[in-house]
Amino acid sequence: MNLNKHSERKFDLITVGRACIDLNAVEYNRPMEETMTFSKYVGGSPANIAIGTAKLGLKVGFIGKISADQHGRFIEKYMRDLSINTDGMVKDTEGRKVGLAFTEIKSPDECSILMYRENVADLYLTPEEISEDYIKEARVLLISGTALAQSPSREAVLKAVSLARKNDVAVAFELDYRPYTWTNTEETAVYYSLVAEQADVIIGTRDEFDMMENQVGGKNEATKAHLFQHQAEIVVIKHGVEGSFAYTKAGETFQAKAYKTKVLKTFGAGDSYASAFLYGLFSGESIETALKYGSAAASIVVSKHSSSDAMPTADEIKALIAQAE
């Protein structure tokens, strides 16, 4: 798939959705009740993907709603310092806050996240705050599934997708399923399917695709067959330690292994994977190589303390692949 048409456009990628605060436990191997020290980072899947792709050298913009307070200013400055354009970032004027995520790292196999997502600013992004002039400056618009969980954010995202299609902007959909945000699985399936059927690239875990299909134990063959009846050109399905698969509408199948690493935590892998996979496509690499980039980036991030700060450079990704092969 060629993502490099419209080279005259201002942005390679614009991501849409939440930007929040991650407070990651500094003290490892102990429960939250006993943890006294946390480090603050920018979090939220679309923000992390914006950060990850910017660190890889892409020209990136962001659309989302943040709080008009210290946390909101921290997020905006952090992203601007990475040369991420924040013209699409809206400040909430009604006192809503950004989401907070406290992470607990009991062991590499036992990590959890304590979320505060009630009445958060990002889910109050409105359709009126989506600018066609901004979106049409991008080659690719990336949608995060969590932004579909509630109105008015849901309608804002659907408008963004419609404007992307109107202006020949490719749509990438990162399923990003977070159960604490949704009301029920039927609702998730409806809105995930609605966007997936309009997306050119869909990325998610096998479990996330099962949520989209409202079933358990779904098969890749059936998933890709359905999506290729619609807009999809590439479907990426991740299977954890078993690696990941990419399918194309032309009938090709590619596979990449998961790279071994010393795991510190289990979160952040999906965002780094999506960032590096898209970077590979933008760089003109083969889909197989883009899969390797995604797997390597995920391996790097789970070995480090943060998600956003740990997003790797292209040299780090290539070095890990070379070492592993």
Swiss-Prot record:
Its EC number is 2.7.1.92. Belongs to the carbohydrate kinase PfkB family. Keywords: ATP-binding, Kinase, Nucleotide-binding, Transferase. The keyword Transferase applies. It holds the Pfam family PfkB. Catalyzes the phosphorylation of 5-dehydro-2-deoxy-D-gluconate (2-deoxy-5-keto-D-gluconate or DKG) to 6-phospho-5-dehydro-2-deoxy-D-gluconate (DKGP). It catalyses: 5-dehydro-2-deoxy-D-gluconate + ATP = 6-phospho-5-dehydro-2-deoxy-D-gluconate + ADP + H(+). Pathway: Polyol metabolism; myo-inositol degradation into acetyl-CoA; acetyl-CoA from myo-inositol: step 5/7. This is 5-dehydro-2-deoxygluconokinase. It comes from Listeria monocytogenes serotype 4b (strain CLIP80459). It comes from the Bacteria. One of its GO terms (biological process) is inositol catabolic process. GO terms for molecular function: 5-dehydro-2-deoxygluconokinase activity; ATP binding.
